[in-house]
Regions:
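Short beta-strand-centered segment that lines the nucleotide-binding/catalytic pocket of NTP-utilizing
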Residues: 30-41
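Glycine-rich phosphate-binding P-loop
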Residues: 8-21
């Protein structure tokens, strides 16, 4: 089966977003990251920044789940938590983007949302702690928290969110077609491996 859709799941700071963007450029296909968030924002009524900050949070019907919801948002007004409402919209948007044609989608549990499609290649990018810590400091600067703590907190949110909505273990090899260590291979080599995988599948 020809692989048209590539999903990139990743540990925070591993370079998965960069790898996905470069892969999309080499394949000449759309890359969905911020664009996906913008579409979810358009359909949900939430600001993109709010979605970025809350779509990976653990679900729950706490008071704060409703306080920050835009007035009149149907899902939230009907009793869904903000996290559940965003998940519903996010799934819909991912399916729409995949139906449009070949693309690379980063994060957002897209590997699970598109698990029933045969034309997808699902990748997970990880890296060792020192590599990731150095990378986020270079990209995002210092913080009151150590880079190691920031990495652990971000990864934990992704892990809990993924497990809740998919019933799977985040980062477990059996959930993906390939897992690549960017700190060992380097970002460029990761891109090349994924490119060759897509091309080999499409040439069969």
């Amino acid at each position: 089966m020809e692989k048209k859709i590539i999903t990139i799941s990743r540990e925070f700071g591993s370079g998965g977003r960069t790898i996905g963007r470069q892969l999309a450029e080499k394949l000449g296909i759309p890359f969905y990251d911020e664009e996906l968030v913008d579409q979810v924002s358009l359909e949900s009524g939430f600001a993109p920044k709010f979605i970025e900050e809350h779509s990976e949070h653990s679900p729950g019907k706490s008071f704060l789940s409703y306080v920050f919801a835009p007035q009149g948002v149907p899902g939230v007004m009907n009793g869904l938590s903000t996290a559940d409402f965003l998940w519903s919209i996010q799934c819909s948007v991912i399916l729409q983007l995949a139906d449009k044609g070949p693309c690379v989608i980063v994060g957002r549990n897209a590997d699970y949302v598109l698990k029933d499609r045969d034309d997808c290649l699902h990748a997970f990018i990880y890296a060792d702690m020192d590599y990731r810590a150095d990378r986020i400091v270079r990209l995002y600067g210092e913080s009151e928290k150590s880079p190691e703590v920031r990495l652990q907190e971000k990864d934990k949110r992704r892990k809990v969110n993924y497990q809740h909505y998919t019933g799977r273990s985040w980062g477990q090899a059996q959930n993906y077609d390939v897992c690549l260590c960017s700190s060992t291979l380097g970002e460029e080599h990761c891109v090349q491996i994924l490119l060759e995988m897509v091309q080999n599948q499409n040439n069969k």
